[in-house]
Amino acid sequence: MKVLVIFAVLSLVIFSNCSAETDEDFFGEESFEADDIIPFIAKEQVRKDKENCIGKHHECTDDRDNCCKGKLFRYQCQCFKVIDGKKETKRCACVTPLHYKMAEMAVSVFKKMFKN
């Protein structure tokens, strides 16, 4: 029964992650012109390079789509409001969301259960 519950939770998290990334990719660029295609391709080629991505807990304010990949999932850029004196600024960092942490924990428990 425990295995069934863990598998169901893991499947649900993976499915929701896949559908969220698909919607984000599909609806991200509403207007797309022919002049934009070459910079777009060059940008995507850079993102595939692991050395040029933004690591965990590093700032991603200017480049929100370039976070590195963690153990199972890609980190997500999460923004926070920082108040310095009376000035409020928006700062972003690459972090692992809570549901990704839960999925990684479920996978590690699942592996430990079937390792023996």
UniProtKB/Swiss-Prot annotation:
PROSITE patterns: SPIDER_CSTX. It comes from the Eukaryota. Expressed by the venom gland. GO terms for biological process: killing of cells of another organism. GO terms for molecular function: calcium channel regulator activity; toxin activity. Residues 1-20 form the signal peptide. InterPro entries: Spider_toxin_CSTX_knottin, Spider_toxin_CSTX_Knottin_CS. The keyword Repeat does not apply. Disulfide bonds join 53-68, 60-77, 67-94, 79-92. It is found in: Secreted; Target cell membrane. Keywords: Amidation, Calcium channel impairing toxin, Cytolysis, Disulfide bond, Ion channel impairing toxin, Knottin, Membrane, Neurotoxin, Secreted, Signal, Target cell membrane, Target membrane, Toxin, Voltage-gated calcium channel impairing toxin. Residues 21-47 form a propeptide. Pfam families: Toxin_35. Its main location: secreted. GO terms for cellular component: extracellular region; membrane; other organism cell membrane. The keyword Glycoprotein does not apply. Spider venom toxin that shows calcium channel blocking activity and exhibits cytolytic activity by affecting the outer leaflet curvature and/or pore formation across the membrane. It blocks L-type calcium channels (Cav1/CACNA1) in mammalian neurons at nanomolar concentrations. Furthermore, it produces a slow voltage-independent block of mid/low and high voltage-activated calcium channels in cockroach neurons. Potassium ions, histamine, M-ctenitoxin-Cs1a (AC P83619), CSTX-9 (AC P58604), and CSTX-13 (AC P83919) synergistically increase the insecticidal activity of this toxin. The presence of a 'disulfide through disulfide knot' structurally defines this protein as a knottin. Belongs to the neurotoxin 19 (CSTX) family. This is Toxin CSTX-10. It comes from Cupiennius salei (American wandering spider).
